[in-house]
């Protein structure tokens, strides 16, 4: 990717939601909500405190994260639809993604 976010910003690629419910009902595109889950594809260096000291970001490329429905700014970079958001817009990191898929 030819983009490097500045300060405490990250670039997130949305992860599409399931197209079927647990009961097997197919959800049409018009009824789907925007996914609030994504994968970090780029990370800025971090913010600065009042003394000018760098505060590194606690996220890394490849992390799967949860964020608010209206978080970030939608952009198109290299033909891909991505979100640019501040680290503070991210609610948390999903850990152990592989175990969740095995249980389903």
From Swiss-Prot:
CDD domains: cpn10 (cd00320). One of its GO terms (biological process) is chaperone cofactor-dependent protein refolding. GO terms for molecular function: ATP binding; metal ion binding; protein folding chaperone; protein-folding chaperone binding; unfolded protein binding. Gene3D superfamilies: GroES chaperonin (2.30.33.40). InterPro entries: Chaperonin_GroES (IPR020818), Chaperonin_GroES_sf (IPR037124), Chaprnonin_Cpn10_CS (IPR018369), GroES-like_sf (IPR011032). The keyword Transport does not apply. Keywords: Chaperone, Cytoplasm. It is found in: Cytoplasm. Its main location: cytoplasm. One of its GO terms (cellular component) is cytoplasm. Together with the chaperonin GroEL, plays an essential role in assisting protein folding. The GroEL-GroES system forms a nano-cage that allows encapsulation of the non-native substrate proteins and provides a physical environment optimized to promote and accelerate protein folding. GroES binds to the apical surface of the GroEL ring, thereby capping the opening of the GroEL channel. NCBIfam families: PRK00364.1-2 (NF001527), PRK00364.1-5 (NF001529), PRK00364.2-2 (NF001531), PRK00364.2-4 (NF001533), PRK00364.2-5 (NF001534). Belongs to the GroES chaperonin family. Heptamer of 7 subunits arranged in a ring. Interacts with the chaperonin GroEL. This is Co-chaperonin GroES 2.
């Amino acid at each position: 990717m030819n983009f490097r976010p500045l300060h405490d910003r990250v670039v997130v690629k949305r992860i599409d939601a399931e197209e079927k419910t647990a009961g097997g009902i197919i959800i049409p595109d018009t009824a789907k909500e925007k996914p609030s889950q994504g994968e970090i594809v780029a990370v800025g260096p971090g913010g600065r405190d009042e003394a000018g000291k760098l505060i590194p970001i606690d996220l890394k490329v490849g992390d799967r994260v949860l964020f608010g429905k209206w978080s970030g700014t939608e952009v198109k970079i290299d033909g891909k639809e991505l979100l640019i958001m501040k680290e503070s817009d991210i609610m948390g990191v999903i850990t152990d993604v592989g175990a969740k898929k095995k249980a389903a």
